[in-house]
């Protein structure tokens, strides 16, 4: 191989090759007669000075790993291949100088790699891990820069250096990324060039369509170590992807959908990040820098690495906007504080937990100074924006949920501005939730709003008694909330001690019933009667109940007992037997009224009363029967002769020969939508209706200890008989059925107290078909 000094265009050759040629020319003085046809992966030490040596051929043995790379049919050929460098002669006979054996060996290696590359275009990628970089330079497996080889055999004696063209469209960029990511997923080690996607264009690309589903799964595959600097992701969708150790510097992520996207250990400095409103879940940043990056007001920054800001100007946004600093990050603010802007930027309760308040607060506590500084800038903006009280009202809860907590309470500026906001928030809570249950407190409410309400009651102690419905609910949820801290519970317990010492409350707790029976609460058990609600109308009336009872009455189920409390007047326990729960709740304790009525509407016993006692024919009697269902005991008795005769006249047509008439039976099935139901389902309903009429005939309602209306006893027994015919399996036994039947009629010496029968049947129904019983039996009787 002869090298000529006149056939090389130096303007197109990388510096390494230029240095190599220059060195050869300097040492050969008068030039070489051979030409370089190809140079590949030449070690950088070739730039050292060439030394003179022998002009005899130099042989180079192939490394074993290169031999093993080829198929067996190639090994025999390659084992015989020797690269000979010969006829490198100095045309200056006066000063023959040859290249040293060391440098010739290096050239041998370069030419050998060229020979191998001509047999497999994948050699460079599979063996050395090298990939082209700009200018034809690559990084080899030992991380040293080399000259990129040609992928095809040389076609001319001139030096050939191949350049790699960039993709021309977002689709091409997406294809290139898919290829690189899949190679990485397969376990291949990518070079820096393989992972270089700087200046890429991914606009409008939905990544879930170009990557396998495993990249979108929780704890799935990761896009790791890629360089996306100065790239465009506008209108793309990178949702559910995890980028680790990636670089996004100066990239544009405008209107990008990044729901639940994770950025970890990444460089996102100087990024324009405005994700789309269709982003459902916030992206997360873990050990990621965001210097001078524009962040929307709905981001979670819990894992961001924050630094001191520089003197950079705010970013330029086409739609305009104001900005505040959060460390070295820029947060976008509205141009004007309108009601819509306040709702969009501040109301995280209305925006799935997202707001600028939550964004700032999401930073860890080690950045408390930066958080306070940013919140002060936000408050100044709100103060200068001159929003009206009506404009602030919808976001008061969101504001106090953040600003009424440390570290922001340390700021005099924030506290001064927030004071009136918190007062209005508290007044609204008292007005709204004194007479209705609070929403079931979630983690957010327990940790952010309950402490604010405790603080407000502490500042305004009179509200404890004037709004005891709300106050007791707040204490209840503080003591039972699984997400409440010990500090919250301790403050709640201390505040309740103040409440119990109030003159309107203290007379009711020294009766041997309250708490631990000595006038103080017992918070070690939920069964203790620790809670005392004052009547909203009569200061002399109070209700005492346990934690469990209060919880279930505020959030009832069909099985909730509505009489498991003490009713106190002047501190003394009074009977509720003849008090209608609905009237008691409406007049004195309205906090339970809505829940009670909601449960009452699900009880359908009244439909049978309307069938038997139509309001047109029996209006007064209908009202008496309905009114009796609203209390445990009735003062109205129907055992006088006139009443007995009237009832007999009404029920006789329904009970020919003591059994339900077919027509009346069909009316019942129709009223309770049982026409197509199974016999067992029909039997369960009739059994529960029988239980209710047994209660009607007992001393608790229309009967006495010694007498009861025969028509009601007979009707109750007829309902039970029909249930037995339909499905004997729903009864405890045939003996129990016979016993109940005898008691209804006083046969065979059976004890005829229908209160006992009603209680026994009710217990059985509650055990074996409780949902049917709960849909029929009046609440006051339950």
From Swiss-Prot:
GO annotation terms (biological process): protein ubiquitination
Active site residues according to the UniProt entry: 753
UniProt EC number: 2.3.2.26
Any one GO MF annotation of this record: ubiquitin-protein transferase activity
PTM: Ubiquitinated in the presence of host E1 ubiquitin-activating enzyme, E2 ubiquitin-conjugating enzyme and ubiquitin.
Assigned keywords, A-Z: Secreted, Transferase, Ubl conjugation, Ubl conjugation pathway, Virulence
Top-level taxonomic group: Bacteria
Chief location category: secreted
Record localization: Secreted; Host cell
One Pfam family it belongs to: SopA
TM regions (residue ranges): none
Chain segments carrying region Disordered: 137-171
GO cellular component term, pick one: extracellular region
Catalytic activity: S-ubiquitinyl-[E2 ubiquitin-conjugating enzyme]-L-cysteine + [acceptor protein]-L-lysine = [E2 ubiquitin-conjugating enzyme]-L-cysteine + N(6)-ubiquitinyl-[acceptor protein]-L-lysine
Keyword Plastid listed: no
Low complexity compositional bias, start-end: 157-171
Family designation: Belongs to the SopA E3 ligase family.
Protein role: Effector proteins function to alter host cell physiology and promote bacterial survival in host tissues. This protein is an E3 ubiquitin ligase that interferes with host's ubiquitination pathway.
Protein name as annotated: E3 ubiquitin-protein ligase SopA
Organism of provenance: Salmonella heidelberg (strain SL476)
Originating gene: sopA
